[in-house]
């Protein structure tokens, strides 16, 4: 994996509050190597470690994107949902930002069936077929379509399991992380001071509660993907 420069600035991370962890009573002792201090009852993350692992993650994503790999970004925490969607769309990644349906990856055949149903309903709506149905039937299909859009809208173009999964909040999306571990899908995960740093392939110590922090980390990661995709297109 080639090391590159990703303009990861400690001052910028401080301004975004990346270094603020959880209260000292609510922490995982395994995070001790990633904590630099305690301040006013909260743990402070060592941003030098954050920069190191963020850089490693960017290198991995660049190399994967350069090889034409596919990515999934998972962040179902309400406050992060919009940032996850916009970052994923910018980098042409799949995303889940509402709810991780249990078995979404480990029971991929069921997910494929749901996705095909979703695509069929979208095609019928686009062709105006749903509106020509009796009102009751049309209303039922529209509700079904709305539900599918909410939970599967970000993965509607997925045709197989992703090559790498980025997870915004380990605690919130633990099920997604465990499914990736079971399937051997490489993971990049933001970890706050209450997380387990040993679960993901690359764990990035960072504040997973502040929008500014989440957005900054995601921006770096998707920039690396975009750069990798550009390299892939140039070298094809």
Swiss-Prot record:
GO biological process, one term: translation
CDD domains reported for this sequence: RPS2
Disulfide bonding pattern of the chain: none
Cleaved signal peptide residues: none
Keyword Chloroplast: yes
Alphabetical UniProt keywords: Chloroplast, Plastid, Ribonucleoprotein, Ribosomal protein
Gene Ontology molecular functions: structural constituent of ribosome
Subcellular localization, as worded in the UniProt entry: Plastid, Chloroplast
Record has Signal as a keyword: no
GO cellular component: chloroplast; mitochondrial small ribosomal subunit
InterPro entries: Ribosomal_uS2, Ribosomal_uS2_bac/mit/plastid, Ribosomal_uS2_CS, Ribosomal_uS2_flav_dom_sf
PANTHER family for this protein: 30S RIBOSOMAL PROTEIN S2 PROKARYOTIC AND ORGANELLAR, SMALL RIBOSOMAL SUBUNIT PROTEIN US2M
Homology family: Belongs to the universal ribosomal protein uS2 family.
HAMAP family reported in the protein's UniProt record: Ribosomal_uS2_B (MF_00291_B)
NCBIfam families, sorted: rpsB_bact
Protein name from the UniProt record: Small ribosomal subunit protein uS2c
Organismal lineage: Eukaryota, Viridiplantae, Streptophyta, Embryophyta, Tracheophyta
